Amino acid sequence: MMEENRAEQLFFLWEKISEGEIRLLRVFGEQPVVTVPGFIDGRCVRELGDYCFSRRKLPENEIRYSRYCGGMWESGLFVSKDKVKNNCIASEQGNAAENIVSLEAIEQDEKLRELSEKYIKEVQLPADIVKIGSCAFYNCTKMERISVYPKLVEVGSDAFMNCLNLRSLQMCAGVEEPTGLKQLLAQIKWQVEVSFEQEDGEREAVLLYPEYYESYDEIGPAHIFELNLTGEGFRARQCFKDGVILLNAYDEIFPQACVEESAEVLIPMAWNRLYTACGLPPEARAAYETYVREQSGKVLTILLKKRELKPLHFFFEKGYGRKEQIEDAVAIASHEEWMEGVASLIAWKRQLFAEQTETADVRSRYAFEEF
């Protein structure tokens, strides 16, 4: 689990939940992307504490630290200030068995940054975490992606408050497994893409959850308020049963979403379901395909910007794109100096549109002979 962090130094502050389990309180590192280890100091990481990735006051309980650097671990007692550290050392009466580190000492290390708020960008949580505390990622305005496992079932209030750049949520689970995704989505009202990925990185399903808005209307002089919900994102977030996502219910939202949502929302909704078509019934497939064909120009533009060959080939192979569009794509890829894309597109044109080309050549020959 720590292979991703091997080249850097990491500091973890934590407290005991039990003898074998801990709650993570703070993380310091050299990079804005971090993989939280499954075990620290021989104890299983079970929870993210309140305000874990936010610059807030630490709890008053006994706090321990663990330092990871170059594949080696060091652990000991954490104190808030050097003065407290000196008092602790004095009280040990020369017993140097316990390492003691202060917050001031950590902050003096020029390589280390507190992974919080405007610095943290991506977090990979370990498999055994069951809880994210309240406001754990409060004000992490630069965070773009978080990866979690199915054991995570409890998410505290406002866990992702002001994390408006968080647009990607990776579930390291199968789409038919019970997970805590519903609890996570309840804390993310803005648009977010969720991918269900296996250990080999294969995406089993990718779902887009649109943004939704809440407003209240006052009814009469009794000060009774009626909740109004705008956007299909709320309904999409309710498509679960016993922690398992109901794909059919999610697909049934699309026709109404076509009325309320913009193309920027509908295109990834439709494309993701077609490209990772896990549990996709024929009627839903037909609705998604109709929309993708209607928006084929915009879809192609998005795919070309990503420079990914597999989805681009899928687009033309399934007949969502026309012959003139693949010719336009060749011109665009050439202009952008994407030579791999140019070569692939030319090959696909010959392979997928050969019959059209031959028919056109025959017609041209007959027309020339008649002339």
Show which residues each predicted segment covers:
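Repeat-mediated protein-protein interaction surfaces in helical alpha-solenoids
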Residues: 271-288, 310-312
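Extracellular beta-strand-rich solenoid/capping regions of secreted or surface-exposed proteins
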Residues: 48-50
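Ankyrin repeat arrays, specifically the small/polar loop and inter-repeat linker segments at the C-terminal end
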Residues: 287-295, 320-327, 340, 350-363
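Ankyrin repeat structural motif
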Residues: 308-316, 338-347, 354
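Extended, charge-rich intrinsically disordered regulatory tails
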Residues: 323, 366-371
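Ankyrin-repeat helical register
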Residues: 302-303, 329, 333
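Structural signature of tandem-repeat unit edges
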Residues: 2-3, 9-21, 28-46, 58-131, ...
